[in-house]
């Protein structure tokens, strides 16, 4: 038995369609709860490579260094160490998107005797380190000793030296005060004063000549040049040695045993040279050198 045709369903009203969609909202909410929550891209992931690849590079300000890590999100920029913001005082201001400013370092040198150490990043107080860059210099102990020795030598050379008297003028100056003393001896009626005689008890010690130098304690420096009278025997001895210097025993040579074979060969060689000189133009080259075959 065929079924009777069914009439089409009536068109629902707009209010009824909205009422039908309301019960679907709890189902949609249940589907969302089942799905895992999506993490934002800015947070760190569980794996280290994916975290470094997905994390966008942090933008650094003009005062931060390239090697300095970005500040954590919970720390304020005022809590950062002051050393990181110090180079910004010398570096010219740059726009925010231009990148980073190069780190500025200076090297402070200590004394040359103890070696030098390099300072870290420059502080903001003072002129810019680009104007006066200093470098460190490490010296070994041997180099320090060499530098100190040269410094002392320069100080000794810089001191003024006392002029030494010339040897030709020194005997004349020492003998000049002795001439009046010799001339004054016969006038007083006493014996002539002998400069080489020892002092008597009444006269006491002789006064040192004005040109003599005195050391501490009254010691007199011996004279450098002797008197002209004492030079004569020394001159005679030196002349005798110069004239007979080969007559000494140490210069005599002992007679040695003569090698007769060597004398014979030398004699034959000399005869061959004489015969070759006589027959140079007549004989050949080998005939003129007969002495070569005798050796």
From Swiss-Prot:
<feature type="modified residue" description="Asymmetric dimethylarginine">
    <location>
        <position position="172"/>
    </location>
</feature>
<feature type="modified residue" description="Omega-N-methylarginine">
    <location>
        <position position="83"/>
    </location>
</feature>
<feature type="modified residue" description="Phosphoserine">
    <location>
        <position position="47"/>
    </location>
</feature>
<dbReference type="Pfam" id="PF15671">
    <property type="entry name" value="PRR18"/>
</dbReference>
<dbReference type="InterPro" id="IPR031369">
    <property type="entry name" value="PRR18"/>
</dbReference>
<feature type="compositionally biased region" description="Low complexity">
    <location>
        <begin position="181"/>
        <end position="192"/>
    </location>
</feature>
<feature type="region of interest" description="Disordered">
    <location>
        <begin position="181"/>
        <end position="227"/>
    </location>
</feature>
<feature type="modified residue" description="Omega-N-methylarginine">
    <location>
        <position position="188"/>
    </location>
</feature>
<feature type="region of interest" description="Disordered">
    <location>
        <begin position="1"/>
        <end position="133"/>
    </location>
</feature>
<keyword id="KW-0488">Methylation</keyword>
<feature type="compositionally biased region" description="Low complexity">
    <location>
        <begin position="14"/>
        <end position="29"/>
    </location>
</feature>
<keyword id="KW-0597">Phosphoprotein</keyword>
<feature type="compositionally biased region" description="Pro residues">
    <location>
        <begin position="1"/>
        <end position="13"/>
    </location>
</feature>
<protein>
    <recommendedName>
        <fullName>Proline-rich protein 18</fullName>
    </recommendedName>
</protein>
<feature type="compositionally biased region" description="Low complexity">
    <location>
        <begin position="103"/>
        <end position="126"/>
    </location>
</feature>
């Amino acid at each position: 038995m065929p079924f009777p045709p069914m009439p089409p369903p009536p068109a629902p009203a707009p209010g009824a369609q909205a009422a039908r969609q309301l019960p679907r909202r709890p189902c949609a909410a249940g589907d969302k709860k089942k799905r895992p929550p999506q993490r934002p891209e800015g947070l760190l992931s569980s794996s280290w490579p994916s975290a470094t690849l997905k994390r966008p590079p942090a933008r650094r300000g003009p005062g931060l260094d390239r090697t300095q890590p970005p500040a954590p999100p919970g720390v304020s920029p005022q809590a950062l160490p002051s050393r990181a913001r110090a180079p910004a005082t010398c570096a010219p201001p740059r726009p925010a998107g231009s990148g980073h400013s190069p780190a500025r370092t200076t090297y402070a040198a200590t004394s040359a005797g103890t070696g030098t150490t390099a300072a870290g990043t420059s502080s903001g107080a003072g002129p810019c380190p680009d104007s006066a860059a200093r470098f460190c210099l490490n010296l070994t102990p041997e180099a320090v000793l060499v530098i100190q020795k040269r410094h002392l030598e320069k100080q000794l050379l810089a001191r003024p030296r006392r002029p030494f008297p010339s040897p030709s003028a020194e005997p004349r100056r020492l003998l000049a005060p002795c001439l009046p003393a010799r001339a004054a001896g016969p006038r007083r009626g006493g014996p002539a004063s002998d400069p080489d005689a020892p002092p008597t008890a009444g006269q006491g010690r002789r006064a040192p000549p004005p040109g003599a130098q005195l050391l501490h304690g009254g010691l007199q420096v011996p004279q450098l040049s002797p008197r002209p009278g004492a030079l004569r025997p020394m001159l005679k001895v030196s002349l005798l040695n110069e004239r007979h210097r080969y007559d000494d025993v140490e210069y005599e040579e002992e007679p040695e045993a003569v090698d007769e074979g060597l004398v014979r060969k030398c004699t034959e060689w000399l005869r061959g040279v004489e015969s070759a000189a006589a027959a140079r133009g007549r004989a050949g080259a080998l005939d003129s050198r007969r002495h070569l075959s005798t050796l």
